[in-house]
């Protein structure tokens, strides 16, 4: 006899973390898209640190298939309830060989049970807008409420880096020196973006500790002593985006006072040229599907829609 068991913990143990990572890698190979975003992977990485994320209302859900031979970890979900204004968000991934066997549905049920009556509805991401996820969403009556596009372009014909606007100096990020200034401007630039705008100095330093971090690809635009904007690039050494390394416009942000003067495009082009000069052949970026002005800007810069992530509401 077999069944599904769901465990809910604040901090998964080391063995489960390793298995969850392997599960996510198997899903990425099968689907061609990473099932878990960077923030969840950082939570998993810090799970052994009792002091990390102490003020974060986050939970890990581990699904196991039970049989007379033992148990096998076949699914995982992450629930973040920290943002009271936006409501809880979740990520779900199921081992490819265990799909269409009730694991995804069991995880959704467990997520629902973790939210108190009166809380805002849970919103669940589907990365890559996969048919299996859409079928489960339709079966459970989930409604799509947000769509995030992945856009890409080749880097072969990127022009030289442009001259900055008058009064602007562009320099690379100095770890330990520019941290606080960047966090302050990032918060203002993304005041209405719950994930990006809430980043703390510790969140920044967590990313600086990752193997992919390169300050030479992190560009800051200064107006005198004041930070006006930034373009942080990233390189995926191996990923679902291609056989070789792929660049990313990781995040571009401007102080609100600097918007509308072309600085965002300048910073974007500086970063694209940097990725080109590193010998990369392609670059991607993420943009809200309903952000028509941003989509128009990126389209003019040669980007086209490659795939989409869809958020469903439970």
Swiss-Prot record:
Function: Catalyzes the transfer of acetyl from acetyl-CoA to desacetylmycothiol (Cys-GlcN-Ins) to form mycothiol.
InterPro entries: Acyl_CoA_acyltransferase, Bact_Acetyltransf, GNAT_dom, Mycothiol_AcTrfase
GO molecular function annotations of the record: mycothiol synthase activity
A Gene Ontology BP annotation from the UniProt entry: mycothiol biosynthetic process
Positions with a binding annotation for 1D-myo-inositol 2-(L-cysteinylamino)-2-deoxy-alpha-D-glucopyranoside: 38, 195, 234, 248, 286
CDD domains assigned: NAT_SF (cd04301)
Disulphide bonds in the chain: none
Protein name per the record: Mycothiol acetyltransferase
């Amino acid at each position: 006899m077999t069944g599904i068991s769901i465990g809910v913990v604040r901090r998964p143990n080391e063995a489960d973390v390793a298995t969850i990572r392997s599960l996510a890698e198997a899903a990425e190979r099968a689907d061609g898209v990473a099932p878990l975003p960077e923030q969840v992977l950082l939570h998993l990485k810090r799970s052994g640190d009792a002091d990390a994320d102490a003020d974060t209302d986050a939970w890990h859900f581990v699904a196991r298939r039970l049989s007379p031979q033992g148990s096998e970890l076949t699914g995982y979900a992450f629930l973040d309830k920290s943002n009271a204004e936006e409501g809880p968000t979740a990520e779900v991934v199921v081992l490819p060989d265990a799909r269409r066997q009730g694991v995804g549905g069991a995880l959704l049920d467990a997520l629902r049970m973790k939210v108190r009556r009166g809380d805002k509805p849970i919103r669940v991401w589907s990365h890559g807008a996969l048919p299996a996820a859409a079928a489960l969403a339709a079966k459970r009556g989930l409604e799509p409420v947000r769509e995030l596009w992945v856009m890409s372009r080749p880097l072969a014909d990127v022009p030289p880096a442009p001259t900055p606007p008058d009064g602007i100096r562009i320099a690379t990020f100095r770890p330990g020196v520019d941290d606080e200034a960047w966090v302050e401007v990032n918060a203002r630039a993304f005041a209405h973006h719950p994930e990006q705008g809430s980043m703390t100095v510790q969140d920044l330093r967590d990313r600086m500790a990752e193997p992919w971090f390169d300050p030479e690809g992190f560009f800051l635009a200064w107006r005198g002593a004041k930070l006006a904007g930034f373009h942080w690039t990233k390189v995926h050494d191996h990923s679902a985006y291609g056989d070789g390394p792929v660049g990313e416009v990781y995040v571009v942000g401007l102080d609100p006072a600097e918007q509308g003067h072309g600085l965002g495009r300048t910073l974007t082009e500086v970063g694209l040229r940097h990725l080109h000069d590193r010998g990369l052949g392609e670059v991607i970026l993420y943009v809200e599907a309903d952000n028509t002005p941003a989509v128009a800007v990126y389209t003019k810069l040669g980007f086209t829609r490659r795939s989409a992530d869809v958020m469903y509401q439970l």
